[in-house]
From Swiss-Prot:
Its cofactor is Mg(2+). This is Phenylalanine--tRNA ligase alpha subunit. Tetramer of two alpha and two beta subunits. InterPro entries: aa-tRNA-synth_II (IPR006195), aa-tRNA-synth_II/BPL/LPL (IPR045864), Phe-tRNA-synth_IIc_asu (IPR004529), Phe-tRNA_ligase_II_N (IPR004188), Phe_tRNA_ligase_alpha1_bac (IPR022911), Phenylalanyl-tRNA_Synthase (IPR002319), tRNA-bd_arm (IPR010978). SUPFAM superfamilies: Class II aaRS and biotin synthetases, tRNA-binding arm. It is found in: Cytoplasm.
Length: 339
């Protein structure tokens, strides 16, 4: 058995010297040290040895096992080191070659305008509130004075997840959640993504950004609403910006209005963009409906408020004269590099 052990050691060491791949080294380990390996087989037969031979052969077998394990590890490290050196040589950088200029990214115009809008309102004392994009039907509709089967629901093509969950069609639900959590005075904006089941075209997208605002306190009037939004428009588009309000209808405000601004293309002269009117719709607004306040346990006899909402994508299009909303979602560097 001593001769067998010495022969196994000699054969294993000889095979290790000839191998050039890590996979071959592993096959040698399995051949000699694996569960069915040659050395393992001999160790299992030691019970047939005499008591005198057993400790001598056992020590020799363990020494050979240790020597083989060390040799296998050294061979594996040698091969890995050789492969690493070859790889490094193949990846050598020729410092005389001209460098490749990296394309520098730019802030997306949608992000720029959204940040500008938030900064304007924060400077006016508004806080920023956030809410879930997957919203309860109650917060998206019912709490906003739009009960089930109300005709106003037909104006918003809604993505329903089930009977009680929707992808929010507006950020107004955040106003309800804020009024439930906070007592007046409240002065907040809620920017974020909203979803409508619209076909994609130059002016419509199933996903777009919206910003809504809410002010609730004692003695709030339409004059406060008008002054706030006119100040926002001047800060956003310049002091020369002219605005006007015209009556409209929203279920969650009474009275309601839409604010128009002078056309950015023709400066109020009339063109194709403004359909010859000289004005472009900017946002919707109004005094918070008393029922909406009641739904949030706020007494409309004590408190009043105003709310407004605007599409951020629309603001970008107006500010930069973009005529197709799809340009903002196609990641075309030729378009983005213009801003």
């Amino acid at each position: 058995m001593r001769k067998k052990l010495e022969q196994i050691k000699e054969n294993a060491f000889k095979e290790l010297q000839d191998k050039r791949k890590d996979l071959d080294i592993e096959s040698i380990r399995i051949k000699y040290l694996g569960k069915k390996g040659e050395l393992t087989h001999i160790l299992r037969g030691m019970k047939e040895l005499s008591k005198e031979e057993r400790p001598i052969i056992g020590k020799l077998a363990n020494d050979i096992r240790t020597a083989l394990e060390n040799a296998i590890e050294e061979a594996s490290q040698r091969i890995k080191s050789s492969e690493r050196e070859s790889r490094v040589k193949g990846e050598t950088i020729d410092i005389t070659m001209p460098g490749i200029k990296q394309n520098i990214g730019r802030r997306h115009p949608l992000e720029q305008v959204l940040e500008d809008m938030k900064e304007i309102f924060v400077s006016m004392g508004f806080t920023i509130e956030e809410g879930p994009e997957v919203e309860l039907d109650y917060y998206n509709f019912e709490a906003l004075n739009i009960p089930k089967n109300h005709p106003a629901r037909g104006e918003q093509d809604t993505f329903y997840i089930n009977d009680n969950l929707v992808l929010r069609t507006q950020t107004s639900p955040t106003q309800i959640r804020t009024m439930e959590k906070q007592k007046p005075p409240i002065k907040m904006i809620s920017p974020g993504k909203v979803y409508r089941s619209d076909s994609v075209d130059a002016t419509h997208s199933p996903i777009f950004y919206q910003m809504e605002g809410l002010v609730v306190d004692k003695g709030i009037t339409f004059a406060d609403l008008k002054g706030t939004l006119e100040l926002f428009a001047r800060k956003m588009f310049g002091d020369e910006m002219k605005t006007k309000f015209r009556p409209h209808h929203f279920p969650f405000t009474e009275p309601s209005a839409e604010m128009d601004a002078t056309c950015f293309v023709c400066n109020g002269e009339g063109c194709r963009v403004c359909k010859g009117e000289g004005w472009i719709e900017l946002l919707g607004c109004g005094m918070v409906h008393p029922q909406v306040l009641r739904n949030c346990n706020i007494d409309p006899e004590v408190y009043s408020g105003f709310a407004f909402g605007m599409g951020v994508d629309r603001m970008v299009m107006l500010k930069y004269g973009i005529d197709d909303i799809r340009n903002m979602y196609e990641s075309d560097m030729r378009f983005l590099n213009q801003f």
